[in-house]
């Protein structure tokens, strides 16, 4: 079968000397959609409609910074020799786990300052986070990055993928696993599940199940990728972090049920920062 190659330009348009890339546009769309989804849950929980503004702003800002720092740390031999590249984020190089860590810390701090319950806020935003991640992976597709190992065109056709995906997985003379798509589908499925089971879960468990679901998918999909950050020659950083997140999340669900028996997410109104008992 002949190849009809419809290459997608990573640059959406130019504003003078500034190139606006599809990656940034798609990330922004993911954040906005996530915001609107979380906003509905926020109002339903009885919280002020402006509550999410500061949380999203600081979590996104510090999440982005942490994502870059995380990437630089695990690529330190290169950046030690090229320190000027550290701030050149437009050359690529961020890591989602770093973003999650930075965003989590910032979110908890904002909750403390605003006297909000971090478990309740976590449950509200968890489906939005994984939805934004699922959308954001299409930014990797537009950049022709974060793909898996080599495959044949016949393999991709057997997946019944649209031609524009198949054709844009042809990179430098070789077809590759569309790992962006695998993770996007996994994340969107996680979003659907979390939204539908949240009302049946206890406070805090939606967020922990988000971490568990995302980490399970990331562990297996990461094994297909060719651009993984490596801790050693055999250990991928993302897989190790995924295992830790799964263990920590499940342990916290069990511990909190035994120790505190928190209420159902759907049975509480607006909650303050926890004091004696973590609810």
Swiss-Prot record:
Topological relation to the membrane, as annotated: Multi-pass membrane protein
Subcellular location per the Swiss-Prot or TrEMBL entry: Cell membrane
InterPro entries from the UniProt entry: Lgt
Any single GO CC term annotated in Swiss-Prot or TrEMBL for this entry: plasma membrane
Enzyme Commission number(s): 2.5.1.145
GO biological process terms, semicolon-separated: lipoprotein biosynthetic process
Chain sites annotated for binding a 1,2-diacyl-sn-glycero-3-phospho-(1'-sn-glycerol): 137
Function: Catalyzes the transfer of the diacylglyceryl group from phosphatidylglycerol to the sulfhydryl group of the N-terminal cysteine of a prolipoprotein, the first step in the formation of mature lipoproteins.
Protein's recorded name: Phosphatidylglycerol--prolipoprotein diacylglyceryl transferase
Organism classification: Bacteria, Bacillati, Bacillota, Bacilli, Bacillales
């Amino acid at each position: 079968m002949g190849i009809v190659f419809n290459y997608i330009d990573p640059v959406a348009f130019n504003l003078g000397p500034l190139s606006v890339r599809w990656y940034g546009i798609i990330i922004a769309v993911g954040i906005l959609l996530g915001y609107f989804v979380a906003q509905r849950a926020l109002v339903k929980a009885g919280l002020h409609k402006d509550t999410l503004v500061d949380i999203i702003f600081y979590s996104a800002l510090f999440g982005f910074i942490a994502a870059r720092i995380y990437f630089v740390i695990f690529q330190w031999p290169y950046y030690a020799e090229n320190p000027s590249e550290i701030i050149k984020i437009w050359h690529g190089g961020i890591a989602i786990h770093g973003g999650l860590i930075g965003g989590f810390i910032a979110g908890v701090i904002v909750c403390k300052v605003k006297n909000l319950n971090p478990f309740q806020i976590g449950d509200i935003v968890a489906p939005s986070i994984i939805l934004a991640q699922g959308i954001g992976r299409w930014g990797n597709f537009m950049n022709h990055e974060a793909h898996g190992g080599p495959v044949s065109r016949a393999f991709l056709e057997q997946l019944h993928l649209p031609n524009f995906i198949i054709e844009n997985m042809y990179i430098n003379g070789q077809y590759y696993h569309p790992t962006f798509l695998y993770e996007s589908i996994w994340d969107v499925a996680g979003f659907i599940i979390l939204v539908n089971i949240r009302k049946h879960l206890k406070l805090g468990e939606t967020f922990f199940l988000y971490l568990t679901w995302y980490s399970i998918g990331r562990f297996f999909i990461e094994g297909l990728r060719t651009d993984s950050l490596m801790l050693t020659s055999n250990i991928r950083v993302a897989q190790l972090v995924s295992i830790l997140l799964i263990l920590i999340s499940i342990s916290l669900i069990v511990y909190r049920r035994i120790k505190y028996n928190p209420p159902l997410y759907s049975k509480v109104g607006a909650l303050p920062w926890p004091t004696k008992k973590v609810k």
